[in-house]
Curated annotation (Swiss-Prot):
Its main location: cytoplasm. Keywords: ATP-binding, Cytoplasm, Kinase, Nucleotide-binding, Transferase. Signal peptide: none annotated. It comes from the Bacteria. This is Guanylate kinase. PANTHER family: GUANYLATE KINASE (PTHR23117:SF13), GUANYLATE KINASE-RELATED (PTHR23117). It comes from Maricaulis maris (strain MCS10). HAMAP family: Guanylate_kinase (MF_00328). Its EC number is 2.7.4.8. Essential for recycling GMP and indirectly, cGMP. It is an enzyme of class 2 (transferase).
Protein backbone atom coordinates (compact mmCIF):
# COMPACT_ATOMS: atom_id res chain seq x y z
CA UNK A 1 0.00 0.00 0.00
CA UNK A 2 1.15 3.56 -0.64
CA UNK A 3 1.22 6.23 2.11
CA UNK A 4 -2.18 7.62 1.02
CA UNK A 5 -3.88 4.25 1.50
CA UNK A 6 -4.21 3.39 -2.18
CA UNK A 7 -2.53 0.31 -3.71
CA UNK A 8 1.07 0.94 -4.75
CA UNK A 9 1.41 1.68 -8.48
CA UNK A 10 2.09 -1.35 -10.62
CA UNK A 11 5.41 -1.15 -12.48
CA UNK A 12 4.93 -0.08 -16.06
CA UNK A 13 7.47 -1.72 -18.32
CA UNK A 14 9.39 -0.31 -21.23
CA UNK A 15 7.59 0.05 -24.52
CA UNK A 16 8.77 -1.73 -27.63
CA UNK A 17 10.47 0.43 -30.24
CA UNK A 18 9.17 1.30 -33.70
CA UNK A 19 10.89 0.33 -36.94
CA UNK A 20 10.26 3.46 -39.01
CA UNK A 21 10.98 2.84 -42.70
CA UNK A 22 11.30 6.01 -44.78
CA UNK A 23 11.29 5.75 -48.56
CA UNK A 24 11.30 8.28 -51.37
CA UNK A 25 12.88 8.89 -54.73
CA UNK A 26 16.39 10.33 -54.50
CA UNK A 27 16.20 14.06 -53.78
CA UNK A 28 12.75 14.09 -52.17
CA UNK A 29 14.14 14.91 -48.73
CA UNK A 30 13.91 11.72 -46.70
CA UNK A 31 17.56 11.85 -45.57
CA UNK A 32 17.23 15.43 -44.31
CA UNK A 33 13.93 14.58 -42.62
CA UNK A 34 15.39 11.53 -40.90
CA UNK A 35 18.39 13.50 -39.61
CA UNK A 36 16.15 16.22 -38.18
CA UNK A 37 13.85 13.60 -36.64
CA UNK A 38 16.84 12.03 -34.90
CA UNK A 39 18.05 15.39 -33.58
CA UNK A 40 14.63 16.04 -32.01
CA UNK A 41 14.11 12.59 -30.48
CA UNK A 42 16.80 11.14 -28.19
CA UNK A 43 15.19 7.67 -28.24
CA UNK A 44 15.44 7.45 -32.04
CA UNK A 45 18.48 5.93 -33.74
CA UNK A 46 19.38 5.49 -37.38
CA UNK A 47 19.80 2.00 -38.77
CA UNK A 48 23.35 1.74 -40.10
CA UNK A 49 23.39 -0.26 -43.32
CA UNK A 50 26.20 -2.43 -44.58
CA UNK A 51 27.51 -1.67 -48.06
CA UNK A 52 30.20 -2.78 -50.47
CA UNK A 53 30.72 0.69 -51.95
CA UNK A 54 33.74 2.79 -51.07
CA UNK A 55 33.40 5.48 -48.38
CA UNK A 56 32.80 9.02 -49.59
CA UNK A 57 34.84 11.91 -48.14
CA UNK A 58 33.83 12.50 -44.53
CA UNK A 59 31.96 9.22 -44.09
CA UNK A 60 32.81 7.19 -40.98
CA UNK A 61 32.75 3.39 -40.87
CA UNK A 62 30.14 2.18 -38.38
CA UNK A 63 28.43 5.56 -38.29
CA UNK A 64 27.39 6.29 -41.86
CA UNK A 65 27.70 2.70 -43.12
CA UNK A 66 29.42 -0.54 -42.28
CA UNK A 67 31.85 -0.71 -45.20
CA UNK A 68 32.60 -4.35 -46.02
CA UNK A 69 33.87 -6.39 -48.95
CA UNK A 70 31.66 -8.19 -51.46
CA UNK A 71 32.77 -11.54 -50.04
CA UNK A 72 31.86 -10.47 -46.50
CA UNK A 73 28.49 -9.23 -47.69
CA UNK A 74 27.67 -12.46 -49.49
CA UNK A 75 28.66 -14.46 -46.40
CA UNK A 76 26.21 -12.43 -44.31
CA UNK A 77 23.49 -13.14 -46.88
CA UNK A 78 24.17 -16.87 -46.55
CA UNK A 79 24.01 -16.59 -42.75
CA UNK A 80 20.66 -14.72 -42.92
CA UNK A 81 22.09 -11.71 -41.09
CA UNK A 82 20.12 -9.08 -43.03
CA UNK A 83 16.51 -7.93 -42.74
CA UNK A 84 16.78 -6.97 -46.38
CA UNK A 85 19.47 -6.41 -48.96
CA UNK A 86 19.67 -5.16 -52.52
CA UNK A 87 22.09 -4.43 -55.32
CA UNK A 88 21.94 -0.79 -56.43
CA UNK A 89 24.13 0.66 -59.19
CA UNK A 90 26.37 -2.41 -58.90
CA UNK A 91 26.85 -2.08 -55.13
CA UNK A 92 25.33 -4.12 -52.33
CA UNK A 93 23.37 -2.60 -49.44
CA UNK A 94 21.81 -4.45 -46.50
CA UNK A 95 20.23 -3.92 -43.07
CA UNK A 96 21.83 -5.99 -40.26
CA UNK A 97 19.27 -7.68 -37.98
CA UNK A 98 21.02 -7.94 -34.61
CA UNK A 99 21.63 -4.26 -33.69
CA UNK A 100 18.15 -3.31 -34.89
CA UNK A 101 16.30 -5.84 -32.76
CA UNK A 102 18.45 -5.05 -29.73
CA UNK A 103 17.43 -1.39 -30.05
CA UNK A 104 13.73 -2.21 -30.49
CA UNK A 105 13.67 -4.49 -27.45
CA UNK A 106 15.38 -1.72 -25.47
CA UNK A 107 12.56 0.68 -26.32
CA UNK A 108 14.36 2.72 -28.95
CA UNK A 109 12.89 3.58 -32.33
CA UNK A 110 14.98 2.78 -35.40
CA UNK A 111 14.76 4.84 -38.61
CA UNK A 112 15.51 3.19 -41.96
CA UNK A 113 16.42 5.14 -45.09
CA UNK A 114 15.49 2.42 -47.62
CA UNK A 115 13.79 1.87 -50.97
CA UNK A 116 10.36 0.30 -51.52
CA UNK A 117 11.78 -3.21 -51.79
CA UNK A 118 13.60 -2.81 -48.50
CA UNK A 119 10.47 -1.44 -46.84
CA UNK A 120 8.46 -4.43 -48.05
CA UNK A 121 11.09 -6.87 -46.80
CA UNK A 122 11.26 -5.14 -43.43
CA UNK A 123 7.48 -5.24 -43.02
CA UNK A 124 7.44 -8.94 -43.94
CA UNK A 125 10.22 -9.74 -41.45
CA UNK A 126 8.82 -7.66 -38.57
CA UNK A 127 5.11 -6.99 -39.27
CA UNK A 128 4.26 -5.88 -35.72
CA UNK A 129 7.20 -3.47 -35.46
CA UNK A 130 7.53 -1.94 -38.93
CA UNK A 131 5.84 1.31 -39.97
CA UNK A 132 6.30 2.47 -43.56
CA UNK A 133 6.28 6.14 -44.58
CA UNK A 134 6.66 7.34 -48.16
CA UNK A 135 7.95 10.85 -48.86
CA UNK A 136 6.64 12.36 -52.11
CA UNK A 137 8.16 15.37 -53.89
CA UNK A 138 5.76 18.17 -54.95
CA UNK A 139 6.58 17.39 -58.59
CA UNK A 140 9.06 15.49 -60.75
CA UNK A 141 10.33 18.75 -62.22
CA UNK A 142 11.28 20.03 -58.77
CA UNK A 143 12.84 16.67 -57.95
CA UNK A 144 15.07 16.81 -61.03
CA UNK A 145 16.03 20.40 -60.22
CA UNK A 146 17.10 19.35 -56.70
CA UNK A 147 19.26 16.55 -58.10
CA UNK A 148 21.00 18.91 -60.51
CA UNK A 149 21.64 21.52 -57.83
CA UNK A 150 23.28 18.92 -55.57
CA UNK A 151 26.05 18.64 -58.15
CA UNK A 152 26.89 15.08 -57.11
CA UNK A 153 25.85 13.17 -60.23
CA UNK A 154 26.47 13.21 -63.95
CA UNK A 155 23.66 13.95 -66.40
CA UNK A 156 23.42 10.24 -67.20
CA UNK A 157 23.09 9.27 -63.54
CA UNK A 158 20.45 11.95 -62.99
CA UNK A 159 18.51 10.56 -65.94
CA UNK A 160 18.72 7.09 -64.38
CA UNK A 161 17.66 8.43 -60.98
CA UNK A 162 14.61 10.09 -62.52
CA UNK A 163 13.60 6.82 -64.18
CA UNK A 164 14.01 5.05 -60.84
CA UNK A 165 12.03 7.83 -59.16
CA UNK A 166 8.93 7.02 -61.20
CA UNK A 167 9.28 3.34 -60.34
CA UNK A 168 9.72 4.17 -56.65
CA UNK A 169 6.71 6.49 -56.61
CA UNK A 170 4.52 3.84 -58.25
CA UNK A 171 4.69 1.87 -54.96
CA UNK A 172 3.33 4.71 -52.79
CA UNK A 173 0.08 2.84 -52.07
CA UNK A 174 1.98 0.03 -50.32
CA UNK A 175 2.91 2.34 -47.42
CA UNK A 176 1.12 3.01 -44.13
CA UNK A 177 1.57 6.77 -44.42
CA UNK A 178 2.39 9.22 -47.23
CA UNK A 179 3.82 12.73 -46.76
CA UNK A 180 4.12 15.29 -49.56
CA UNK A 181 7.31 17.25 -48.84
CA UNK A 182 6.24 20.61 -50.24
CA UNK A 183 6.99 22.34 -46.94
CA UNK A 184 9.86 20.91 -44.91
CA UNK A 185 8.69 22.12 -41.49
CA UNK A 186 5.20 20.71 -42.02
CA UNK A 187 6.57 17.44 -43.40
CA UNK A 188 8.76 17.07 -40.31
CA UNK A 189 5.80 17.85 -38.06
CA UNK A 190 3.75 15.13 -39.75
CA UNK A 191 6.60 12.65 -39.39
CA UNK A 192 6.83 13.37 -35.66
CA UNK A 193 3.06 12.95 -35.33
CA UNK A 194 3.23 9.56 -37.02
CA UNK A 195 6.03 8.41 -34.72
CA UNK A 196 4.27 9.60 -31.57
CA UNK A 197 0.99 7.93 -32.57
CA UNK A 198 2.72 4.65 -33.40
CA UNK A 199 4.46 4.64 -30.02
CA UNK A 200 1.04 4.51 -28.33
CA UNK A 201 -0.20 1.38 -30.08
CA UNK A 202 -1.13 -1.48 -27.78
CA UNK A 203 1.34 -3.91 -29.36
CA UNK A 204 4.23 -1.60 -28.43
CA UNK A 205 3.45 -2.07 -24.74
CA UNK A 206 3.81 -5.77 -23.84
CA UNK A 207 3.74 -4.88 -20.13
CA UNK A 208 0.04 -4.01 -20.44
CA UNK A 209 -1.09 -7.65 -20.27
CA UNK A 210 0.47 -8.16 -16.85
CA UNK A 211 -0.70 -4.71 -15.77
CA UNK A 212 -4.34 -5.44 -16.68
CA UNK A 213 -4.20 -8.89 -15.06
CA UNK A 214 -3.04 -7.27 -11.83
CA UNK A 215 -5.84 -4.71 -11.96
CA UNK A 216 -8.42 -7.44 -12.48
CA UNK A 217 -7.15 -9.29 -9.42
CA UNK A 218 -7.57 -6.28 -7.12
Amino acid sequence: MSSDGYPAPIFRGRRRGVLLALSSPSGAGKTTLSKRLLSQNPDVVLSVSATTRKPRPGEVDGQDYHFISVDEFKKKIEDDEFFEWAEVFGRYYGTPKTPVMEAVEDGRDVVFDIDWQGAQALAAAAPDDAVRVFILPPSLALLEDRLRKRGQDTTEIIKDRMARAKDEISHWHEYDYVIVNDDFARALEKLNEILHAERLKRLRHPWLEEFVDAIMEQ
